[in-house]
């Protein structure tokens, strides 16, 4: 079963237990496994209403939030190729990536991000805000997740700050392999501890290692606390979690062993 189906099964098993929480202005908002699946369902319904073809690209431009994760899982389940974009990057650099990846639509966390793109690219694909996407759309029947192992599921770009940005295409099988490696490494790091981990996560999801990490945590049934403002990490971090992911250790899980 491709990774997205495994994550959905884990969320269903979590039921009324919290799986994600985000900190915003000192306030914590949490969702259970059931509630996260409901958010995914709403986003899938919105995407299905746009009659997109399998394999079309979906830009994702937002800061780290619960809805970012729901949007990513929804687009993947609908057979789309997600193009995650770093929300702090200059609009003209993001436009260059979009012109290369040609998304059919772009999902934005807020109007400021949307306007920054549209002001720099008059011919941009349709942009939709999360508030629109997660509103309920009635009368749309959803199929089972449309993902096969060989299907491309994401295009992740280099920053483009020191040269032309380059996109790397990953299939569901590629992602599934990395999730297995990362989970195995966490088993080693935790020394056989069986209780569910509590994790504070702040690295932007548009970075590959960060995205793989948070998918791994969902698969493992961990409780993940998301920082939504990088400037507030010192206030958000204390006492929130047992693990604080960094890029090198996570990326190292995928390196070949001698």
Q: Language model features by range: what are they?
A:
Residues 1-19, 38:
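A short N-terminal helical cap/helix-turn-helix that marks the beginning
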Residues 30-34, 153-180:
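Conserved AMP-binding A3 loop
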Residues 59-61, 68, 72, 76-105, ...:
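Short beta-strand->loop structural element characteristic of the AMP-binding/adenylate-forming
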Residues 20-65, 69, 73, 90-95, ...:
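Conserved AMP-binding/adenylate-forming core of the ANL superfamily
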Residues 15-18, 140-157, 163-164, 190-198:
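Conserved pre-ATP/AMP-binding loop-to-beta segment of ANL
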Residues 176-198, 205-258:
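Conserved AMP-binding/adenylation subdomain of ANL enzymes
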Residues 58, 75, 106, 152, ...:
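Conserved S/T- and glycine-rich ATP-binding loop of Class I adenylate-forming
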Residues 49-50, 77-137, 142-148:
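Structural core segment of the AMP-binding/adenylate-forming
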